[in-house]
Amino acid sequence: MSDSDRHREQAKLYKYYTETKIATEVTRQTLVLVLAGGEGSRLKGLTKWRAKPAVPFGGKYRIIDFALSNCINSGLRRIGVLTQYKSHSLIRHLQRAWGFLRAEIGEFVEILPAQQRLGQQWYRGTADALYQNMDIMHRHAPEYVMVLGGDHIYTMDYSKMLMMHVNSGADLTIGCIEVPREEAKAFGVMSVDTDMRITRFTEKPEDPETIPGRPDLSLASMGIYVFSTSFLYSALIADAEDPDSSHDFGKDIIPKAIHSANAIAYPFRNEDGTQAYWRDVGTLDSYWKANMELCAVEPELNLYDRNWPIWTYQTQHPPAKFVFDDEGRRGEAIDSLVSGGCILSGARVKRSVIFFATQIESYSTIKDSVILPKVTIGRNCRICNAIIDKGTFIADGTVIGEDPEEDARRFHVTPEGIVLVTPEMLGQNLFLATVPK
């Protein structure tokens, strides 16, 4: 190696270590607040007894595990989770899965339930949730505050977004993705200039603005924000004092910030510049699709990336078991995810996600379905295009997903024909609490 080549390599190493050190300092100065109090009503029966971020996903995880794993893998170790709606299972999961951080060196996942800290009202919106916890934010004294939703599926290095925020001198940075124009109606939509400064922002517009030169795409907010702390405090106080505000980031805080502050967009892309994987699983159809995508030979969302593990609570189950090898009675799974503790006793599973501790009896066939934990499926069942909720018992000979009219009489059928089955729909009351008729 020549002297000039050696100097270039040394310069690259110096630049890498310098940038890494700066990024580490920035992440240490950042407080992450995860909004996890949403009801998730579009998920119907899946959120009857649990908050949306606590809904199981991908065979063994909860939805919130993806945002929290991104934090840990990005070097962010000061995290608050704001809870409200039916939060018991979520809080229990956080206590079991996320108690491994070291409080003595300033690492934590702190649960921040709605407590009426500033009056008689619960969290009235996403912005109000932060406003009611401003004293806690003050105590941690961060330079930057990152706000995340706890209900999306993706893997992302947040430190890169933080560094863009710091280097640009922005007051506010918003993570964004490109989405088809028709789908953009469900998101906050923004316009940017050539320097990625946001010039317009509209929450859930009827007529979404498109990307210049790309009339079929819009630039949509991911619900990920980085704030310089002093700006955030000012914005939250002003919003709390506004009697006409709905106290929501997308409807109130962000549109006002565009006109009064330096707000920039951070495009979430892969290393090659293509659109990175990000899924809003807020409907049963989108939830089912995101799970089905994991069954591909090489899915976009790589759960097997050792450099970016998805952390969760590891329940103690034996390995999955496949038994019987007779014609018509063979325990097998094809293009599927099957978790620990499952027994496929002469049953056939194809293109499905089977969560832990599920048992499927002989001569049954499961296709294109999501089977949540601790489900028992009897003999001679045929199930396709379905989501079966946790703890459901499916009797021998049950057929689901073949007759839309019959399914609609017994269960919930989505616009795209996915059948949701819960224990309550089958008269199996798993909870002592009942709602008076």
Model-assigned labels for residue ranges:
Residues 98-106, 194-200, 262, 298-303:
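Proline-centered turn/helix-capping motifs that create local helix->coil transitions or kinks
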Residues 156-230, 237:
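Conserved core of the sugar-phosphate nucleotidyltransferase
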